[in-house]
């Protein structure tokens, strides 16, 4: 997460990296180098060490390295909700709740506005039976 939001603040690669996955002194938080977007939050919460030897879904590295460290974006993460507040917008559309079902590494976020009183059937009628007729189950079937 810090590597993605702060790619230039620290040295992240090589034998002289400031931090490695086994460092005991990784900062709890850092100020990001740029303003964080909704897409940045989604990417971080979907992260699974992609592009590294530790990626549990990737093909690089050996079997002992892949999945060695627990990533955020694993298939057991079932739901994401993000509130976006936009003070520069009219009040009735200034807040958006972004919702995503199923594993964050494989899902997509859908915007919901608080002022909207109805939701399309595909998004609202989940049902207890698995079906591709609704967004919830379609998302769950991907992962």
Residue spans for each PLM region:
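C-terminus-biased signal that marks the final domain/tail of proteins
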Residues: 1-143
